[in-house]
Every structure is written in C-alpha cells, then in structure tokens.
C-alpha cells in the first residue's frame, strides 16, 4: 500500500475531487480526515469509506475561518497523533463572467476567502505539525486557469487559483529544508458538483461526454483522475518532486487561446 500508516487531511473532502482523493487514499492504507461544511454529507462519505474497509473521519470546518482550521488540526492530532499529508482542495466558483469592473465585491471576497485564504490557513497550521514529524506532503488543487485567463471565468476565480500556484512555490522554498514537499494539481473540466454533476451520475457516459468540445480528449475528467494525481504527490514515488505543477486537463491547456 502506497500510503500505509499515513494520515491525510482533505479539505472539501465530501464531494468531487476531494471525495475521489479520499477514497483512493483510503484504499492505499491512509487514514483520511474529510474536512468540510456539510456535516450530513461528510459523515455519509466517511461512513461509506469505512464500510469499504478504509479509515475515515469527518470534521466540520470552514477553511476560511482561522479558529475552525486550528480546531481541525487539533482534532486530527488528537485522533491520529500526526499529519503526513494535506490536500488543499476546498474551492468555490460563482460561475459568472466577472471582469474587474463587473464582479460583485462580496462574491469576490467569498471566492478568495475559501479558495486562497483557506489554503493559506491550512498550510499555516499544518506546517508546524509536519516539521515535528520530519516532513510531509502538501498538495494544492488549483486549476488550469491559474495561468491562463478566459472570458468565461470570474476575476476572483482566476486570482484565487493563480494565488494557490504561487503559494505552492513560496511554501516549497520555505520548508524544503524540513522535508516538506509542496506541489500543485491543475485540473481542467472535471465532473463534479461545481460542474453541476452529482457523484451518482459519474457512470453516465452521456453526461461525462457532454462537454466534449472543451478539451481534446472529448470528455470530462473523473474525480478519480485528480485523486490519482494527488496520490502520486502524497506518496514516496514523488519524494524528489516539489514546487511542481501537474496538469490533469485532457489537453485543455494546450488549446486555450
């Protein structure tokens, strides 16, 4: 097992790419902590993982609130004694065409708070715990849009994801001496609730191929596609990889004009 005896916090772990990573990590021997705001959904997913032989706990937390992030870290340490892996996956997108002169300030603040501030806070409070145990892996789930602007995405979303990419680089150089590796995943169009596709619909090929014109592979990615990328960064297979970005986008970035 590639993550045997490891402990991972996955923010936004109750749905989409976070759930995909949680299920894969658990199958590889990792104890996973699903962090999120929706208690009933999170506890249901954690129960599903346990029923399939994995170790999973849901902890309710809003990653944009410092005190709740501190509590998330403290509860994880109390339950498992350590944190080896952090997957900063929680994210929102208001799905509006928001140029700087158009986007609502309240919506802007909300997206930045969850996507970027949330990743910053989790990193801030996890790093000391990783230093104590001699290292760890931090994975930031950004976007193919962290380095390319489009007319169809909001200013806040682009800035939040671009900021996550730079958070990876800053954290990488700051903590490499402590054997903490930090990497970014850049997903393209993945079939998640953010894309209005529920987990139960993932086996429906008509739905998955509904956005076939978006990317060269002519289908949307599955949450497991991002989960396996996260598994690589979480495992010792990437022990010499830090400060890196991995595109999981079906070729989308190659065709963005």
Model region roles, listed by residue range:
Residues 14-16, 38:
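Conserved glycine-rich cofactor-binding loop
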Residues 128, 173-177, 239:
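Alpha-helical segment proximal to the catalytic Tyr-Lys
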Residues 96-100, 104-112, 211:
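Substrate-binding pocket helix/loop in short-chain dehydrogenase/reductase
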Residues 93, 97, 230-231, 242-257:
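Short C-terminal tail/terminal secondary-structure segment
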Residues 92, 139-163, 168-177, 189-190:
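Catalytic loop of short-chain dehydrogenase/reductase
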Residues 184, 206-237, 241, 248-250:
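C-terminal helical subdomain
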Residues 39, 61-72, 105, 224-225:
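The beta1-alpha1 cofactor-binding region of Rossmann-like NAD(H)/NADP(H)-dependent oxidoreductases
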